[in-house]
Amino acid sequence: MRFNQYSYINFPKENVLSELKKCGFDLQNTANHKDSLETFLRRFFFTYQDTNYPLSILAADKKTDLLTFFQSEDELTADIFYTVAFQLLGFSYLVDFEDSDVFRKETGFPIIYGDLIENLYQLLNTRTKKGNTLIDQLVSDGLIPEDNDYHYFNGKSLATFSNQDVIREVVYVESRVDTDQKGLSDLVKVSIIRPRFDGKIPAIMTASPYHQGTNDKASDKALYKMEGELKVKLPHKIELEKPQLNLVQPQGQAELIAEAEEKLTHINSSYTLNDYFLPRGFANLYVSGVGTKDSTGFMTNGDYQQIEAYKNVIDWLNGRCRAFTDHTRQRQVKADWSNGKVATTGLSYLGTMSNGLATTGVDGLEVIIAEAGISSWYNYYRENGLVTSPGGYPGEDFDSLAELTYSRNLLAGDYIRGNEAHQADLEKVKAQLDRKTGDYNQFWHDRNYLLNAHKVKAEVVFTHGSQDWNVKPLHVYQMFHALPTHIHKHLFFHNGAHVYMNNWQSIDFRESINALLTKKLLGQETDFQLPTVIWQDNTAPQTWLSLDNFGGQENCKTFSLGQEEQAIQNQYPDKDFERYGKTYQAFNTELYQGKANQITINLPVTKDLHLNGRAQLNLRIKSSTNKGLLSAQLLEFGQKKYLQPYPAILSARTIDNGRYHMLENLCELPFRPEAQRVVTKGYLNLQNRSDLLLVEDITADEWMDVQFELQPTIYKLKEGDTLRLVLYTTDFEITIRDNTDYHLTVDLAQSMLTLPC
């Protein structure tokens, strides 16, 4: 384990003493260090009647147990302090470590022995081996009462609200959109779990079209075959209009009553970060949105009608929209328990909705935590003039996602009444998708949140993985740079795939978000501020560093690609083409081994490099015909240890999100040997070589100069490493699978790779 502590806040000494005293640690500034440590430990072991026993089973050094040490005349030393501290954090002395000073350096332990009271205070705020901070572990065990009131420690809310005796209710928010054109505003179901409290509380809201269930069968039927010819497009400039949103006004009167009438029973799934905040005094709201089970309207996937309906939930929390008790719209209930302050959470589609909501500038949205969220839907299902699929989901497109998330069809009555209209709407969507050309058009323009990024007022926290080929890193990169300069923005850029990171051992992500939301939503005045970029070092396990920016580097390193011309044959023998189509993983393996139709260029790294931003290929290239698809991947090549993209379980159900509440696994990205690691990749239709909005002719056998930016990333390379650039045509996981007989030729002498560093 390595310690990477970003959540700790330096408080004045009087605050430290006061907070310790409130938790029963009655330490005196004038006492000697040894006496203070003993006083601290006897309170620490509050679950024991006889505190001599837990002291006797800890060690001060290799010869002395802690009780014997306190009964001796020996002085407290730094070595003894560290030895005790590591044991309190769950490490076994003489098993996990033998020399505390060596272990302190190996783990990056954040505490430097000096002022003992401040050391102990920071120790309580430090994560244990099993994933909780020490103070959270003690509170979970009953250190302070579960009194349904707020208690703070180091600028973070503690788990002092009951997660058993909570209010569980359902309301139906009246949106300002009418997606199915029935003349009534769409209703959106809101599932609420909130702690009991006499005052007003903030809300954690997760906007998830998946929450009420998904129609997997209908979605699977809507998948496309990726086999087909790359279309030759007529040259033209793509014209666009400013997206429009038509809103509807509230209709009719509704009796105001005191409480919701529908009780929330089981929910499909909760998000463990939300679970963590519930006993800390934050309401949990789950909203599936228009076109989902128990709501009304069509599934408009990603457009501002969908976003508006989610926004209206925040409006209701602030008294600007109504919520009915049921679908009759006869009775309404106010969110009189809400303080109006909201944070959004969730990954993938959920993080996408956070991005979209932020761009409305809605009052009350204080923080978004957008994890692996889409910023422009074109870049999810298309790339540079190509029809593409999200990584791992070949054949998926917007209409199959619509079928997946239109969960109203899971209710037989809704299916009978509404499926015909839903299918008619879906046909319109299919026509607008334009799978023939892969070009950007008005449909995608209406789902581009970057256009409204200037409206963002909330503080923004992103998480994204360098190995996320589902929602690719371009999404967070573009959103990060599109935000207004005065906005506080933060990015946790890890080396995983499309995954959550709130239960990783190496980073205090939950505690950092607690500090932020306690400040922004509960009004605690602290100096807490996350760094702009928190990056997971790819060269070592469990190592995180603070950076000033994502991209924007002034320096670069250029690699020449060779001296000769090389060709890429597009067509495969039928047997190989069929085999790769059935198992794209086999294609990826053989591509990395140099066995596919490709140009492979190994580039020695002659000095340490820290890639930060978008690698760019400048290529002199020609096609043997009037079309061309170019794929590129940049690998770090060579057998060595690399961080793996998916977290592994270190210990099962050891993270406590409250008081024995929603226990979850402690995880981490493994660090183990592999033959290579993908650094970045990209795909380009050569007819869109100059600009996404410009379609140009390709003249057979005529040289073209192409600038091709790959996916943004942050990646460290050391002298002696090897980069491998792979250029090819069809990618059997991502692109259309065109097996026509043509080839691309690259003049390597007139081509180069540039890395921002």
From Swiss-Prot:
The gene is pepX. It comes from the Bacteria. GO terms for molecular function: aminopeptidase activity; dipeptidyl-peptidase activity; serine-type peptidase activity. PANTHER family: COCE_NOND FAMILY, PUTATIVE (AFU_ORTHOLOGUE AFUA_7G00600)-RELATED (PTHR43056:SF10), PEPTIDASE S9 PROLYL OLIGOPEPTIDASE (PTHR43056). Its EC number is 3.4.14.11. It is found in: Cytoplasm. Removes N-terminal dipeptides sequentially from polypeptides having unsubstituted N-termini provided that the penultimate residue is proline. Belongs to the peptidase S15 family. Homodimer. One of its GO terms (cellular component) is cytoplasm. The active site is at 348 (charge relay system), 468 (charge relay system), 498 (charge relay system). One of its GO terms (biological process) is proteolysis. It comes from Streptococcus pneumoniae (strain Hungary19A-6). Keywords: Aminopeptidase, Cytoplasm, Hydrolase, Protease, Serine protease. It holds the Pfam family PepX_N. InterPro entries: AB_hydrolase_fold, Galactose-bd-like_sf, Pept_S15_Xpro, PepX_N_dom, PepX_N_dom_sf, Xaa-Pro-like_dom, Xaa-Pro_dipept_C, Xaa-Pro_dipeptidyl-ppase/CocE. This is Xaa-Pro dipeptidyl-peptidase.
